[in-house]
Curated annotation (Swiss-Prot):
Residues 50-279 form the Peptidase S1 domain. GO terms for biological process: proteolysis. Belongs to the peptidase S1 family. One of its GO terms (cellular component) is extracellular region. Disulfide bonds join C79-C95, C204-C220, C229-C255. GO terms for molecular function: serine-type endopeptidase activity. It comes from the Eukaryota. Residues 20-49 form a propeptide. Keywords: Allergen, Disulfide bond, Hydrolase, Protease, Secreted, Serine protease, Signal, Zymogen. Its EC number is 3.4.21.-. This is Mite allergen Der f 6. Protease that shows specificity similar to chymotrypsin.
Amino acid sequence: MIKIFLVTILIVITVTVDARFPRSLQPKWAYLDSNEFPRSKIGDSPIAGVVGGQDADLAEAPFQISLLKDYLIMKRHMCGGSLISESTVVTAAHCTYGQKASSLSVRYGTNQRTSSSYGDLKVKPIIQHESYEQDQTQTDKTIIILPNPVVPSTNVQMNEIETEDIVDGDKVTIYGWGLTDGNGKDLPDKLQKGSMTIVGNDRCNEKWGSINAIHPGMICALDKTQSGCNGDSGGPLVSANRKLTGIVSWGPSKCPPGEYMSVFTRPKYYLDWITKNIV
């Protein structure tokens, strides 16, 4: 039976403060049997990140951010995201659903998960798409406003939203600090990247349509050996000309996914909403 992931959040207090991945901390991919979707009968499933990827230089993704969650006496990586203006980050709604802005921070200007010479910025308002529902995959996007604008530099740059058509067969790249092994527990310290190929929505819907219909606000990508899952949520999928093409949203329970596509929110489709809320 086909299983897919949807995301829920569960915070569990624990005394673990080392580099091990706290599975209970992050928005967790959970599986739903095909005949249950999109109901909220959720169960745990193994989680993963940019599986099969490689280290990414900061120059490749100076727009990448780490969304951090206050966790006991420290901050822990929860999701990825992209700077789209000096004061605005775009990420996935499932990363911020139910979260208080006061408990979140943004780390930027680094490809090292655990350090940045720029410091971390507390999150100001969270602007979640008004149509988003926790147990569904549509409108999976949130805008985060920073209290102070970042200063653009070699290491800190904004990512422009891709407005050109991205079609079946186009090459794209995913970035993130998610787990690199579906059965692992350790997050990589260095940003990872993975190459994927766009799959047209019609073909993607042939795989997913009976479980969760693919609509124009989604974009699909596939590589049988590389993919993004938990820990990469909210992070960027970029086109060959380095523009923001997708926001990591959901995918199959197996990582890497084999013949099932990873599914991303398509920023171009929601450009009016993003433009209205950008600072």
